[in-house]
Amino acid sequence: MNEHSCLLSVIIPCFNYEAYVGEAIDSVLAQQADDVEVFVVDDGSTDASWDRITAYGDRITAIRSQNQGSVTACLTAFQRTSGQFVYILDADDKLAPGALALIRPHLRPEVSKVQFMLQPIDHQGQPVRAPTPALDPTRTSQQMIDDIVRRGSYLAPPTSGNVCRRDIYESTGVPDYERTAVDGVQHLLAPFIGEVVSIDRVLGFYRIHSANESGFAKVSVERLDRVINRFSNRLAHLRQLLDSRGVAAGVSFRSDYAYTGELVLMRAIVAGRSPTRQELRSYLAALEREQAGLGRRLRQLFAILMYALPLPLARRLVRFRLNPLSLGRLQTVIKSLSTGGGRRGTTMNEGKS
């Protein structure tokens, strides 16, 4: 690491979030940290976002790019940063007061990522569901690697809940399969090359509002295909990164994880047909390998219903499954009924991409 660099670079990518970008910037500037630099990238907004951003003057570095997607926007800003660690904060999210004071002690050379819990909020800033995800601070990087091998991912928050060591972004570049998400292969790589620290406290706010919630209800075959392909491409990219570093040579990844198996069932329904018995069996077999307890039983139930229900009802079930607010309400009910006290997590990517 460059001994003359600052400790942390914050990058805030923005596209048409004039109503929220000021809150995001304010939440970082309010941390009162001298070793933090702030970059805000307007990715070709057509609203007043740029005016909101430039109003902060020299307290931030404002960058304007041509609507190339948040990945390219973030990496454009990254090239101008000097931080030993990088934090990407979505423009409609915000940090909690005092968050950086709790994160800073963990920003050590051997740490590849610090992750923390987020409180989902609506457009007015009101909580809409329980904090997510339920992180376990005792969980080790090796356990996270085991999770990736077993199910293709590990429990991690959306973009705004992660601070990554600089070399993670230096090594990944702009994947040709990824345009909108910066929390993909980067976060998969983290446990393989360092210690991942999990803070089981809410240190940020993750906004779910009409601009991103509605996307979950507008499901299409094309969108599901993109998600399925992106999941597979991330793992293939991860394998390339590990090989280039000479890391985890004996680790291999499957092609039939439960995450994509469930999406295959949904894709069939969206395409206008019921899932086949083989598609159902493949998904249920993956669940048996990867999960246990109440979470597995609920996903088994969802799968059987998607297979057995008439198409109109099955389509409604798919929309319910993919909607973050509906899923949050279901999780609240489950939590109230459960006496096991287990930590909850999801296999669905609930990001905004």
Explain the meaning of each model-derived region.
Residues A48, D93-P105:
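Acidic donor-binding/catalytic loop of UDP-sugar-dependent glycosyltransferases
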Residues Q79, S141-V219:
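Conserved nucleotide-sugar donor-binding catalytic segment
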Residues S27, D34, D42-D51, N67, ...:
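A conserved acidic beta->alpha catalytic loop
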Residues R150-G152, T180, F205-S353:
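C-terminal subregions of glycosyltransferases and related glycan-biosynthesis enzymes
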Residues L8-Y20, A24, Q31-Q32, V41:
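A conserved hydrophobic helix/loop-capping motif in glycosyltransferases and polysaccharide synthases
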Residues V86:
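Short aromatic/hydrophobic "clamp" motif used to bind/position activated sugar donors
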Residues S65-T81:
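Glycine-rich, basic loop-to-helix element that forms the pyrophosphate-binding segment
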Residues S70-A73, L100-I168:
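Flexible acidic/His/Gly-enriched loops in nucleotide-sugar-dependent glycosyltransferase catalytic domains
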